[in-house]
From Swiss-Prot:
It is a multi-pass membrane protein. GO terms for biological process: photoreceptor cell maintenance; protein O-linked mannosylation. It comes from Danio rerio (Zebrafish). This is Protein O-mannosyl-transferase 2. Disruption phenotype: Morpholino knockdown of the protein results in developmental delays at 18 hours post fertilization (hpf). At 48-72 hpf the tail is abnormally twisted, and pericardium formation and eye pigmentation are also abnormal. Swim bladders are incompletely formed. Glycosylation of alpha-dystroglycan (dag1) is severely reduced.
Length: 756
């Protein structure tokens, strides 16, 4: 099944800027150069050819016959496994409650907040819209019936992109190894993996992300094969398509940065190779450099920015995500109380206000009837920062002496004034004292204290307008204000830390002894109600596109790092993933419910793990052989290059998509491993194929041929049979759970941590 190109490099017409190069002889002992001519990471394997005067290493022809029948079979199997029972179960499963809802928001043009960039949700919403979904299903919780709503279009879109992964893997491995056997093994690992199937069948970001990651790798490999014809149409096509896929990867999730790094390393090595080519002028090298800067940096940045521009244009109506953003950001949203709003320009005594922290995603100053628990400072009313608009965000501005002059014109609050802030709902004053803050130990606790506005001297705060002078009035929305506590000298601050369950997971508010001006200690007056004052228009506050783009990224990054596990939810560990330690419940928990369980096919995953170890051993042996200039026969040279170049690129891709999770502080889930799993599967295809082909070193030619074909057949049949055993995990189960001996899955619970 191997595809070995027949055309010699020396027979090809080279019309590129690097034409007229000479093909160098290979030293009789040094059969493989220690530093391959085209770099360590690329998509072209060397081929050994015979010419007068010795052996040469040259690139395989790109005109070699592609095994169309095998590729067609891969496509058919991939599509059929992903679309089978696509409408079942007819209820919300796992994170469909998030991403289906967000697709609805796009259809309804309602603004929301999410920790991921918008492209994936935009495409889900577009798929739903084009297939007749009207955006009215609420997606409240897993298990809710879809009933008459057209949810299938969004699932089908995700399944279609998921169906592309095995064909992409086939083409990538075919380019890297020039072996259709290796390509078929790699594709089969993805076709028959129950985990990949499950992720592809629901309204999730994962199949969209993996589509763009695999597309980026395929386009990069294809671009590498165009080295003999730089600046040709196909050369530009694959370069620009690589940039397009990179922008798509990053536009779905920030995990796309890992494949950008992979392509960046490949590009850097490629440019280093060109720089060392003395037949290439510096002018031509500059053209190569500028072309890659345009195709792999400028184009992806432009497309990525365009994604956000469309996102902001479509989501122009106020929604549940408003409170995560600044007052200026909210003023552009139709339906928000700040959009085209008018309110009093200057703060006055007797005004009812909301106070928003200027730290991005800092929240509104908030209180409620709940008290700090015993052992956490004083047992008084909690004061927090809350990210959503709420009645408990309202505060009444009162004078130092607590008097209310209801007659005459209102008196403005000015820089240097000493005020009280009374919580509108509970009538307790904003208060601080010499008790330690709940989380930030060097800060002081902030509480609500007093009854009906009466309290003590610890309720007094001095207003300071940042950059202002004594007597300057406080401007609503535009003035940056700080509140200095008179009794302790500290400054009101939002620490950005999330309180435990007793604090309703809201943001900690403290009084900081560090009085230096920072966004954490700066606030602005957002809502302002005072019927005695004239109103002015706030339209001038709308921010520029670059300002909202920057703010969106800061909010996403902080939101992502702040994700914590829910109640009774296990935080998956990265070391769990390669060994398939534990899956995820997508639907159902008991024997009467329709159960779907995200778990990789254990035969495939454990084979991938074994192949990783085998690859490291083979790579070490090959590297030592090259370093010691060991003489090798023809096919051994090809296999050595395949391991070091094609295998090296895939191994690096696996490392880049797996190791960073060990240093992430956010909650992690099992499904985060699947991009790395794709690289592992492609590497398995190359590793096993090389092992099978090298059986000829141990056995006679005829016997090794039969053993190789037998090994290939055993592998493929093993994938199919293991898929047959575990397919209920993807397509649904009913009846007793696997720990019950009466269950049809009882004998398949090979690890106690599996919960199906």
């Amino acid at each position: 099944m191997d595809v070995r190109p027949k055309e010699n490099f020396s027979q090809r017409q080279d019309t590129s800027a690097v034409r007229h190069r000479k093909t160098c002889k290979v030293n009789e002992r040094a059969e493989i150069p220690s530093q391959p001519h085209n770099g360590t990471i690329n998509g072209v394997n060397k081929r050994i050819t015979k010419r007068e005067g010795g052996e040469h290493i040259s690139s395989p022809s790109r005109d070699a016959h592609v095994p169309v029948f095998i590729l067609a079979l891969v496509i058919v199997l991939s599509v059929s496994t992903r679309f089978y029972k696509i409408t079942e179960p007819p209820h919300v499963c796992w994170d469909e409650t998030h991403f289906g809802k967000m697709g609805s928001y796009y259809i309804n043009r309602t603004f929301f907040f999410d920790v991921h960039p918008p492209l994936g949700k935009m495409l889900i919403g577009l798929a739903g819209y084009l297939t007749g979904y009207d955006g009215t299903f609420p997606f409240i919780k897993p298990g809710d019936k879809y009933e008459h709503h057209n949810y299938w279009g969004m699932r089908a879109f995700c399944a279609a992109l998921g169906s592309c992964l095995p064909p992409f893997a086939f083409l990538v491995v075919l380019e890297l190894s020039q072996s259709s056997t290796a390509a078929l093994i790699a594709a089969s690992l993805l076709i028959f993996d129950t985990g990949c199937i499950t992720l592809s069948q629901y309204i999730l970001l994962d199949p969209i992300l993996m589509f763009f990651i695999m597309g980026s790798v395929l386009c990069m490999v294809k671009f590498n094969t165009q080295r003999l014809g730089p600046f040709s149409f196909s050369w530009w096509f694959w370069l620009l398509l690589t940039g397009l896929c990179l922008s798509g990867s990053l536009g779905v999730k920030f995990v796309g940065l890992f494949v950008i790094l992979l392509v960046g390393i490949n590009t850097a090595l490629d440019l280093w190779r060109l720089l060392g080519d003395l037949s290439l002028s510096l002018v031509d090298f500059g053209k190569h450099l500028l072309a890659r800067v345009f195709g792999l940096i400028m184009l992806p940045l432009f497309l990525y920015t365009t994604i956000f521009a469309i996102h902001f244009i479509v989501l122009n109506r106020s929604g549940p995500g408003d409170g995560f953003f600044s007052s200026a950001f909210q003023s552009r949203l139709i339906g928000n109380n700040l959009h085209n709003a008018s309110m009093p320009e200057y703060l006055a005594y007797g005004s009812v206000i909301t106070v928003k922290n200027l730290r991005i995603a800092g929240g509104y100053l908030h209180s409620h009837w709940h008290l700090y628990p015993e052992g956490v400072g004083a047992h008084q009313q909690q004061v927090t920062a809350y990210l959503h608009k709420d009645y408990n965000n309202l505060w009444l501005v009162k004078r130092l002496d607590n008097s209310d002059d209801l007659t005459g014109s209102p008196e403005l609050v000015r820089h240097g004034d000493i005020i009280r802030l009374e919580h509108k709902e509970t009538t307790r004053n904003l208060h601080s004292h010499f008790h330690e803050a709940p989380l930030t130990k060097k800060h002081l606790q902030v509480t609500g204290y007093g009854i009906n506005g009466s309290g003590d001297v610890n309720d007094l705060w001095q207003v300071e307008v940042c950059g202002g002078r004594k007597g300057d009035p406080v401007k609503v929305l535009r003035s940056k204000v700080r509140f200095l506590h008179r009794a302790t000298g500290c400054v009101l601050c939002s620490s950005g830390k999330t309180l435990p369950k007793w604090g309703w997971e809201q943001v900690e508010v403290t009084c900081s002894p560090y009085v230096k001006e920072t966004p954490n200690s700066q606030w602005n007056i957002e809502d302002h109600i005072n019927p005695k004052l004239p109103n002015i228009s706030l339209a001038v506050l709308k921010p520029t596109f670059l300002e909202i783009l920057w703010e969106s990224h800061i909010v996403m990054i902080r939101g992502n790092s702040g994700l914590k596990p829910k109640d009774n939810e296990m935080n998956s560990k990265p070391w769990h993933w390669p060994i398939n330690y534990q899956g995820l419940r997508f639907s159902g928990v008991n024997e009467t419910e329709y159960r779907v369980y995200l778990l990789g096919n254990p035969v495939i995953w454990w084979l991938n793990l074994l192949s990783l170890a085998l690859f490291v051993i083979l790579l070490t042996v090959a590297s030592l052989a090259v370093q010691r200039r060991v003489k090798m026969e023809g096919m051994m040279k090809v296999h050595c290059h395949t391991l070091m170049e094609g295998g090296g690129m895939l191994f690096l891709g696996w490392l880049l998509h797996y190791l960073p999770f060990y240093i992430m502080g956010r909650i992690l889930y099992y499904h985060h491993y699947f991009p790395a799993m794709m690289f592992s599967s492609m590497l398995t295809g190359i590793t096993l194929d090389i092992l099978l082909q090298n059986l000829q070193l141990l056995f006679s030619s005829s016997l090794s041929h039969y053993l190789m074909r037998g090994g290939q057949s055993v592998l493929l049949l093993g994938f199919i049979y293991s898929f047959y055993l575990f397919h209920p995990l993807s397509y649904g189960m009913r009846g007793p759970l696997a720990h019950d001996s009466a269950s049809s899955m009882a004998g398949l619970r090979w690890m106690e941590s599996w919960e199906f």
